[in-house]
């Protein structure tokens, strides 16, 4: 927390994998250490990503007791065959049980992730999932389209179809651009009819429940990443943490011994495998393409305020 000692933390997001896999006492320890190390706003948004297959009632009660006030639950689909195809460890029934437990634990700000453009998924099937989720009345819904990344098992399995889709050709199992566009438009229409306002390409929320943490990314506010390979943006220097587990543990074993001189001067320390100063032109480019992800867009006034120019 030394490099951010003069800053007040307004959001915390614990993700980057499956934090709900951790035994609850470790999440409690993490929350306590964050409060010792940082000046956290009393009204801070504190989110934990959750996999429905690794949640328990006890974990949820512990999260609530130690200050977590927002959950992001990776449901992805309400159909078990689609969940199996995605390699998820939960069933829809498990999700429903844990969603109810989250409400009983007192959580009043919950996001649910849904995924479209799955292999063999029809528009009707996807919309069925969407309507089932809406019926649960979460405060926030994230609706993403599946991106098949090269080098992943998913890509190896569907690479011929993925290549065809990239070339604009029809495929047997993956939806084409027209279908994806139809799903996107239908998603927006159905969600807005049910009181969810789109505020970013893939994100919809009831009034006042927009994800403040993600908005910070899109507005290029400074953020500090902790953990293997985590990224940070501090004073227009972008850092990437070491990806070597043993090196990371060694460098953070005595947190008071970690030098911040490199952070203050835009240089990589042993903890960072990379540190890049973001040029003014790159700052402007990022500000524009990230800002245009949001429905609010980019205003002349905000741009002038950020870059002292028009």
Feature-to-residue mapping (PLM):
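C-terminal scaffold of the Radical SAM
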Residues: 1-309
């Amino acid at each position: 927390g030394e490099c951010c000692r003069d800053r007040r933390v307004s959001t915390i997001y614990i993700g980057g994998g499956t934090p709900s896999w951790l035994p609850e006492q470790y999440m409690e320890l993490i929350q306590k250490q964050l409060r010792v190390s940082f000046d956290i706003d009393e009204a801070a948004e504190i989110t934990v990503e959750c996999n429905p297959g690794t949640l328990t009632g006890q974990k949820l009660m512990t999260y609530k007791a130690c200050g977590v006030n927002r959950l992001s639950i990776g449901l992805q689909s309400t159909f078990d065959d689609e969940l199996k195809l995605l390699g998820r460890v939960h069933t829809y029934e498990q999700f429903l049980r844990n969603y109810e437990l989250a409400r009983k634990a007192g959580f009043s700000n919950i996001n649910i992730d849904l995924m479209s453009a799955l292999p063999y998924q029809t528009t009707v099937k996807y919309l069925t999932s969407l309507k089932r989720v809406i019926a649960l009345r979460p405060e926030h819904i994230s609706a993403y389209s599946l991106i098949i990344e090269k080098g992943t098992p998913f890509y190896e399995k569907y690479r011929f179809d993925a290549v065809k889709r990239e070339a604009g050709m029809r495929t047997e199992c993956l939806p084409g651009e027209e279908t994806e566009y139809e799903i996107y438009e239908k998603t927006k229409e159905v969600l807005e009819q049910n009181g969810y306002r789109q505020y970013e390409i893939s994100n919809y929320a009831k009034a006042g429940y927009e994800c403040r943490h993600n908005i910070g990314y899109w507005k290029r506010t400074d953020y500090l990443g902790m953990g293997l390979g985590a990224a940070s943006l501090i004073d227009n220097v972008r850092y990437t943490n070491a990806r070597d587990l043993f090196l990371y543990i060694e460098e953070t074993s005595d947190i008071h011994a970690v030098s911040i001189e490199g952070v203050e001067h835009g240089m990589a320390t042993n903890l960072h495998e990379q540190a890049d100063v973001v040029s003014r032109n790159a700052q402007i480019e990022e500000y524009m393409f990230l800002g245009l992800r949001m429905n609010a867009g980019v205003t002349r006034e905000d741009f002038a305020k950020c870059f002292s120019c028009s």
